[in-house]
């Protein structure tokens, strides 16, 4: 969590470095629309534009480049101070878990909320990479990292790294009750699937291939940066179906929506909890995740 860095400063730096609103927004698990509005609000506040916009491209203009050169060293210093305070303040009292930001949004939101539900736990988004796993865990920046992505054999063989497999996460489909009388396999083929933007980076397509292609189903998958509730609303209206984790079924209205599994057998997504070997809170963290998904957390 940023302490001294303002949201406008952070968003400006991210956009300057990525030249893409959607990618910049993904890094902090925002959707593109509010991120773009924050940049427009910044430009309005200072009284001049910072970016050149052409079609889908965006880049710093001359004024933006000058501001970036002045601001980036300040941003780096403040970021270092934020990290120092965060790390020193939490070492004695908190477990910090990094949540892979490629998770489907509803799963990401459930995991990030562990920090609100369990005393002594802080959850924060991370951009998953093999080097990031090594650096964050071995340098004690994070106690745990949870991800649907598996590291290579090179990293698996590190002596001080532990990889705990979580119970496979059951995934199914949500569709409007107006299709109550239709065959589920027909709906999977005919209705477009509406998914969050982040899911196409979390081995989602590979999972779909493994489960759908053998059934002869070739879905049309549409990725949109919707919130969970916006996605559910679109499904309720009958325009789409969508994939959700089974634990999220209790969060929607069963009078208007129907849950069903994939043909022949349910789909499952594997997850991994990374930590330093013999971390004393590994079992505790695994229990927190399981309880929260079962709906038995305190």
From Swiss-Prot:
Cited SUPFAM superfamilies: Periplasmic binding protein-like II, Winged helix' DNA-binding domain
Residue ranges of the annotated DNA-binding region, renumbered to this chain: 21-40
One family name in Pfam for this protein: LysR_substrate
Keyword Flavoprotein attributed: no
Keywords: DNA-binding, Transcription, Transcription regulation
Domain HTH lysR-type as annotated: residue spans: 1-61
InterPro entries membership: LTTR (IPR050176), LysR_subst-bd (IPR005119), Tscrpt_reg_HTH_LysR (IPR000847), WH-like_DNA-bd_sf (IPR036388), WH_DNA-bd_sf (IPR036390)
GO MF entry, a single one: DNA binding
Keyword Transcription regulation carried by entry: yes
Record-level GO BP terms: DNA damage response; regulation of DNA-templated transcription
Matching Gene3D superfamilies: Winged helix-like DNA-binding domain superfamily/Winged helix DNA-binding domain
NCBIfam families per record: station_TF_SrsR
Family: Belongs to the LysR transcriptional regulatory family.
Descriptive protein name: Uncharacterized HTH-type transcriptional regulator YgfI
Natural source organism: Escherichia coli (strain K12)
């Amino acid at each position: 969590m940023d302490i001294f860095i303002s949201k406008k400063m952070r968003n400006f730096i991210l956009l300057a470095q990525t030249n893409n609103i959607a990618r910049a927004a993904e890094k902090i698990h925002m959707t593109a629309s509010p991120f773009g509005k924050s940049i427009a609000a910044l430009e309005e506040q200072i009284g001049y534009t910072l970016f050149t916009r052409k079609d889908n491209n965006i880049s710093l203009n001359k004024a933006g480049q000058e501001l970036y050169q002045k601001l980036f060293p300040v941003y780096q210093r403040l970021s270092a101070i934020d990290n120092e305070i965060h790390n020193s303040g939490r070492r004695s009292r908190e477990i910090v878990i990094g949540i892979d930001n490629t998770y489907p949004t509803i799963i990401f939101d459930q995991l990030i909320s562990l920090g609100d539900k369990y005393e002594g736990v802080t959850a924060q988004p991370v951009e998953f990479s093999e080097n990031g796993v090594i650096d964050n865990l071995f340098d004690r920046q994070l106690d745990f990292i949870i991800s649907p992505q598996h590291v290579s054999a090179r990293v698996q063989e590190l002596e001080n790294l532990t990889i705990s497999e979580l119970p496979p996460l059951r995934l199914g489909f949500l569709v409007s009750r107006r299709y109550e009388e239709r065959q589920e396999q027909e709906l999977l083929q005919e209705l477009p699937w509406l998914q969050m933007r982040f899911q196409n980076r979390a081995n989602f397509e590979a999972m779909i291939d493994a489960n759908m292609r053998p059934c002869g189903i070739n879905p049309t998958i549409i990725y949109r940066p919707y919130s969970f509730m916006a996605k559910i609303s679109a499904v309720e209206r009958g325009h789409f179906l969508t994939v959700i984790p089974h634990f999220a079924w209790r969060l929607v209205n069963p009078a208007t929506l129907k849950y069903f599994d994939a043909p022949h057998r349910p789909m499952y997504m594997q997850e991994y909890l990374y930590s330093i070997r013999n971390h004393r809170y590994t079992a505790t963290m695994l229990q927190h995740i399981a309880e929260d998904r079962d709906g038995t957390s305190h």
